[in-house]
Amino acid sequence: MDKNFLEIQNGSFSASEKNKVNNVNLVIKNQGEIISLLGPSGIGKTTILRTIAGLQKLTNGKIILKGKTLSSNSVHVEPEERNIALSFQDNSLFPNYKVIDNINFGKKRLNGNGSSLKSNEIIKLLRIEPILEKFPHQISAGEAQRVSLARS
């Protein structure tokens, strides 16, 4: 039987006493599958994503990622090891950095070598080569969102 890439079983998450999400069940069958969480403000979409990415703790239930069970009392898995990136509506690009520098910013901090083959493939896939030398205020909202995806 094939393992799912990600599964949440009766997951509960809490960003604060006010912002609680209970009994979430979710299955993502394949790595690379694109999903969207939709709902009104304050319903817990960001809390769920932050927990999956390892930025918040699971308070109850299980998250199974690539066959490895994560629970509120499990061994911590670093966010980088989860290999999950988040991209939100507010892309928060650095206004004084060119697009290419925005894309490579985190990579330079993590490994010191800047753009990688994978970054170049993503740049081509997202068709943002023509805007790499522009600043965020010089590009459209859609282009800014693609830059945010490339950076993540």
Summary of predicted features, one role per range:
Residues K68, G114-I131:
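Conserved ABC ATPase "signature" region
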Residues S36, L86, V147-S152:
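ABC ATPase nucleotide-binding domain "signature" region
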Residues L38-P40:
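The feature captures the beta-strand-to-loop junction immediately N-terminal to the Walker
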Residues F135-Q145:
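Conserved ABC ATPase signature
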Residues A53:
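Helix-to-loop junction immediately C-terminal to a conserved catalytic motif
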Residues G61-S72:
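Conserved ABC transporter NBD signature motif
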Residues L70-A85, R109:
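ABC ATPase NBD coupling module
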Residues Y97-S116, L125:
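ABC-type ATPase nucleotide-binding domains, specifically the catalytic core motifs of the NBD
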